[in-house]
């Protein structure tokens, strides 16, 4: 599996060169240091192998490396942030989950 990082998207490509999923995170208009975790999608043939979790982790690393603030829209990513208190500092204070 290869992962291709582009501005505002990380894609997963299988060993045959076929796209099998991605996470998209467009910028928030007027805030160059903010992105919206819009969606994670994994094609049916890629499901059941932890790919959504891997894409989410790579997104979190991307956000930390670039000092981004994250707004949560995708239910999957929102659940990941809720389950990982260590991600909370990527969120605005009013968006953080009470632990």
Regions found by a protein language model. Give the residues of each.
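Conserved acetyl-CoA-binding loop-helix of GNAT-fold acetyltransferases
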Residues: 48-60
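A conserved beta-strand-loop-helix scaffold within acyl/acetyltransferase catalytic domains
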Residues: 6-11, 15-32
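A short, internal acetyl-CoA/4′-phosphopantetheine-binding micro-motif in the GNAT/acyltransferase core
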Residues: 40-47
């Amino acid at each position: 599996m290869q992962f291709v990082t582009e501005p505002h998207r990380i894609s997963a490509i299988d060993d045959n060169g076929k796209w099998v999923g991605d996470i998209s995170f467009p910028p928030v208009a007027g805030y160059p240091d903010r992105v919206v975790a819009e969606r994670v999608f994994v094609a049916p043939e890629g499901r059941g192998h932890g790919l959504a979790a891997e894409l989410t982790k790579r997104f979190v690393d991307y956000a930390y490396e670039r000092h981004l603030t994250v707004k949560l829209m995708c239910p999957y990513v929102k659940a990941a942030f809720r389950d990982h208190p260590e991600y909370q500092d990527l969120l605005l204070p009013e968006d953080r989950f009470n632990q």
